[in-house]
Each structure stands twice: as C-alpha cells, then as structure tokens.
Amino acid sequence: MKDMKEVGAFVARVRKSQGISQLELSLAADVGRRFVVELEAGKETLQSGKLLKVLSVLGIDLRLVEPKGV
C-alpha cells in the first residue's frame, strides 16, 4: 500500500465485510470512533499504536518486508 488513503479504504472494506460498525470497531480496539472515521478517510496524522490496535481487532496482519539487498 502506498498511502494512508489505501490503508483506510482497506480497513473500511475489511470492517464492512465482517459486519462491524465503526462504533463497534472503536470500542473493541479501545480507540475513539473519530479515530476510526479518520483512519478510513485516509487521514495522514494517525497514531501508530492505535492503528495497530484496529488492525489487530480486524485480524489484519501487518508485515514489513526488507528491501531487496538489505
């Protein structure tokens, strides 16, 4: 994924496929509903800890891949 808009769209798609509302997701991840709204909108100024909580609740595995040659 290249930017936060893609991340936000992905999170929204997964959330909806699981039948979870933004409010339900925010409660399960212990973040504010506004955070979920802004995340799904692709807002750039996100707190990484909260992002990781949301991804965890949705069962999304975040992987970091080293560049070739490192």
Residue ranges of predicted features:
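DNA major-groove recognition helix of helix-turn-helix/homeodomain DNA-binding modules
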Residues: G49-V65
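Short, charged recognition helix plus adjacent turn
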Residues: T45, R63-V70
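Hydrophobic alpha-helical segments, especially transmembrane helices
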Residues: K16, L23, R34-F35, L51
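A detector for short, charged/polar N-terminal pre-domain segments
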Residues: M1-E6
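Short basic helix-loop element that most often maps to the first helix and adjoining turn
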Residues: A9-A28
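Recognition helix of helix-turn-helix/homeodomain-like DNA-binding domains
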Residues: D30-E44
